Amino acid sequence: CIRDRLGGDLEGDSEEEFDEMFEVNFKGPLRLVRETLPELRKTGTGRIINVVSLAGKRPRNPKILGYSASKFAAMSLTNAIRISGWDDGVRATSVCPGMVRTRMTDEITVPDGEFKMEPEAIAETISYALTLPNSAAVAEILVNSRLESMF
């Protein structure tokens, strides 16, 4: 997400707020895939990694409903890519991290003794998924932290 905050409160945020999250978290990746999928098919080993979120996998906070729903949509997109591209060697994976130290989470305080994951941990996870052979396909990788209940 390139936004600077989580959002989409069930009872408080506007419909425009929800639209913005779907524009960034679902429609943006959809447009990129539509542009690149034909070339990825030609390679026979194309790879697509969507960074989703545990919030899209297991939403627990109604204050970030829009964020969670848009990330769930991104996960659905990844599943559609994986099925559509399978016979042409295209593999797609959703990486679903928990709380990561980013600009978006800067304002979120965590309980004593807890910590946010570093972005490098997610980068390593993505790198791993990209190196798998075509015979090994991973639909999703959940990267939990002890802060999962905050999502």
Task: Identify what each model region corresponds to.
Residues 9-10, 14-22:
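Substrate-binding pocket helix/loop in short-chain dehydrogenase/reductase
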Residues 1-2:
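Short, small-residue-biased leader/transition segments that mark boundaries at the very start
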Residues 33, 70:
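Active-site helix of classical SDR
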Residues 13, 59-68, 80, 109:
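Active-site loop-to-helix junction immediately N-terminal to the catalytic Tyr of the SDR YXXXK motif
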Residues 58-59, 80-90:
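Active-site-adjacent segment of SDR/Rossmann-fold oxidoreductases
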Residues 87-90, 94, 111-151:
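C-terminal helical subdomain
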Residues 53:
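Residue(s) in the substrate-gating loop at a strand-loop-helix junction
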